[in-house]
Amino acid sequence: MADLAKLVDDLSSLTVLEAAELAKMLEEKWGVSAAAAVAVAAGPAAGGAAAPAAEEQTEFTVVLAAAGDKKIEVIKEVRAITGLGLKEAKDLVEGAPKPVKEGVSKDDAAKLKAQLEKAGAKVELK
């Protein structure tokens, strides 16, 4: 039990950037995605009553296709949307095409797409 208490104390002392990096490292180590886990957990709550609506796509992935000419503005928007640090956001933008946000609703995906396109990026919804 003392090990668990120490672990809780250590995790509580992490900064937001360190916590985001830890989450990314755990996702890579375990081969999972935190966004997918949230989507799976939210899925059963809808129940079987939504079966007719299942034909229409309800979850979207916002994919940064290209940064365009205003790369700095796009990096700022990616940071605002994802909460990533400067280096991580820069790597994501320079590594396009890459997903920015996964498992988002149609409305949220449209808003994020508009935000990124306003900054100068080319964006796809999948």
Curated annotation (Swiss-Prot):
Cellular-component GO terms for this entry: cytosolic large ribosomal subunit
Keywords for this protein: Ribonucleoprotein, Ribosomal protein
GO biological process, one term: translation
Disulfide bonds: none
GO molecular function: mRNA binding; structural constituent of ribosome
Pfam families xref list: Ribosomal_L12, Ribosomal_L12_N
Source species, domain of life: Bacteria
Function, as annotated: Forms part of the ribosomal stalk which helps the ribosome interact with GTP-bound translation factors. Is thus essential for accurate translation.
Family, as annotated: Belongs to the bacterial ribosomal protein bL12 family.
NCBIfam families: L12
Self-association state and partner proteins as the record states: Homodimer. Part of the ribosomal stalk of the 50S ribosomal subunit. Forms a multimeric L10(L12)X complex, where L10 forms an elongated spine to which 2 to 4 L12 dimers bind in a sequential fashion. Binds GTP-bound translation factors.
Listed name of the protein: Large ribosomal subunit protein bL12
Taxonomic lineage of the native organism: Bacteria, Pseudomonadati, Pseudomonadota, Alphaproteobacteria, Hyphomicrobiales
Gene name of this polypeptide: rplL
